[in-house]
Amino acid sequence: MKEYEKESRILKALSDKTRLQILECVQNGISNPGEISRELSRHRATIEKHLRVLLAAEIVEKVPSLTRKGQLTIQYRTRKEAADLVRVIQEHIAGFE
């Protein structure tokens, strides 16, 4: 019998309102924890905790980049497969309204 570990991890990660808001930010180009925390008016530590869950579920991935001043920073982006999944889920949920 199939264990459904990956499916469970992904659905659990997507079942949190804050993580869905973070995904929306990332998909809209707000992609580092500091920017996301300001956008959502949440503590950076809270955002980073939720990003770790999204990373573990392979919904987002880290992308190193440089600031204009040449400092290394970490950006996040939604994996294409995850973005497609979220879109399909949202379309199906809209049918319940």
Over which residues does each language-model region extend?
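Long, low-complexity, charged/polar intrinsically disordered regions in eukaryotic proteins
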Residues: 1-3
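N-terminal helix-turn-helix DNA-binding core of bacterial DNA-binding proteins
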Residues: 5-46, 65-68, 72-78
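Alpha-helical residues within the helix-turn-helix
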Residues: 38, 55-56
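Residues within the DNA-recognition helix of helix-turn-helix
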Residues: 50
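A short, conserved structural fragment
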Residues: 58-65
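Conserved segment of winged-helix/HTH DNA-binding domains
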Residues: 69-97
